[in-house]
Amino acid sequence: MTEMVPAWVEGRLMPVEKLEAHQRGLRHMAISVFVMAGEAVLIQRRAAGKYHTPGLWANTCCTHPRWGEEAADCAVRRLREELGITGLVTVFADRVEYRADVGNGLTEHEVVDIFVAEAPSDLPVNPDPEEVWETRWVDLTDLAREVKEHPERFTPWLRIYLAEHMERIFGKLRVVQ
């Protein structure tokens, strides 16, 4: 099935096939979700079969809204599809734009609506193995340190979020130095 995502072509937002958007480096819409339990964040390691950044650690989940889909609805959908997570309230935290080479001649040039959701630490997680290799809870401070020490283990977008947008995503109480 071809997945059509909202992308800008010659200044106009229109449906574009997802792989084509990455091959051409088109600016396109995306969502990212961070599920938090206190100061811990749920992160995922991307499945080995993903067509870009396989095996790298990323935020809880991220994807592209389908053409015509609202970002908030997309965030809830992908929590369910990727991780089997339901019933959380996702709250819009920020909109971020970035551009990053993700290997294999592909570029992510995303306008990302970022959502945060609070969860209990015993939240049931049931990852789809086609999407997610593994998950883990990690303290936000420890995650920021890990990303600085071993950036090659993490997706470009997670590195960008933590380096450039911590306060805007997590608020003043969760800013890590």
From Swiss-Prot:
Q: Which gene encodes it?
A: idi
> What is an example of a Pfam family matching this protein?
NUDIX
Q: What is this protein's function per UniProt?
A: Catalyzes the 1,3-allylic rearrangement of the homoallylic substrate isopentenyl (IPP) to its highly electrophilic allylic isomer, dimethylallyl diphosphate (DMAPP).
Residues crossing the lipid bilayer are none
- A biological process (GO) annotation for this entry? photosynthesis
- Protein name in UniProt: Isopentenyl-diphosphate Delta-isomerase
**Top-rank taxon:** Bacteria
Active site, UniProt feature: 62, 110
Species, as recorded: Cereibacter sphaeroides (strain ATCC 17023 / DSM 158 / JCM 6121 / CCUG 31486 / LMG 2827 / NBRC 12203 / NCIMB 8253 / ATH 2.4.1.)
Any one Gene Ontology cellular component term annotated for this protein: cytoplasm
Which reaction(s) are listed as its catalytic activity? isopentenyl diphosphate = dimethylallyl diphosphate
Annotated Mg(2+) binding lies at 62, 82
Homology family: Belongs to the IPP isomerase type 1 family.
Arranged from A to Z, the UniProt key words for this protein are: Chlorophyll biosynthesis, Cytoplasm, Isomerase, Isoprene biosynthesis, Magnesium, Manganese, Metal-binding, Photosynthesis
